[in-house]
From Swiss-Prot:
Belongs to the UPF0235 family. Gene3D superfamilies: YggU-like. It comes from Rhizobium etli (strain ATCC 51251 / DSM 11541 / JCM 21823 / NBRC 15573 / CFN 42). This is UPF0235 protein RHE_CH03912. InterPro entries: DUF167, YggU-like_sf. The lineage of its organism: Bacteria, Pseudomonadati, Pseudomonadota, Alphaproteobacteria, Hyphomicrobiales. Pfam families: DUF167. SUPFAM superfamilies: YggU-like (SSF69786).
């Protein structure tokens, strides 16, 4: 259920499932501001959405800030966003509960 993209554009860093979307994020904690840096690829060619938060990576503070940033950006409750992989790593996979097509549309702004 991934969205096809025109030639030359990066593939989206998310996958759609029946009741949620999984988003790959590379987080920069202590990043000076809470914001997204756009989509990029890692050394293995996997795409991710870059994000930075002002919170430090202690006791889950940066993860909580990331969840708040993502939930606000796609218009869901914080409780609808969870880290399912990479709890202590910079690269994380987030599960966002909701209509996956609607969530993907809201994230497509980062593909432009």
């Amino acid at each position: 259920m991934d969205h096809p993209l025109p030639a030359g554009r990066l593939s989206p860093p998310w996958k759609l499932f029946a009741d949620h979307l999984r988003l790959t994020v590379r987080l920069t904690p202590n990043g000076g501001r809470d914001a997204f840096d756009g989509i990029d690829t890692d050394s293995e060619g996997e795409t991710y959405l870059g994000a930075r938060v002002t919170a430090v990576p202690e006791k889950g503070k940066a993860n909580k800030a990331l969840i708040a940033l993502v939930s606000k950006s796609v218009g869901v409750a914080k409780s609808s966003v969870s880290v399912i992989s990479g709890e202590t790593a910079r690269k994380k996979i987030l599960r966002i509960e909701g209509d996956p097509e609607d969530l993907a549309r809201k994230l497509e702004v980062f593909l432009e």
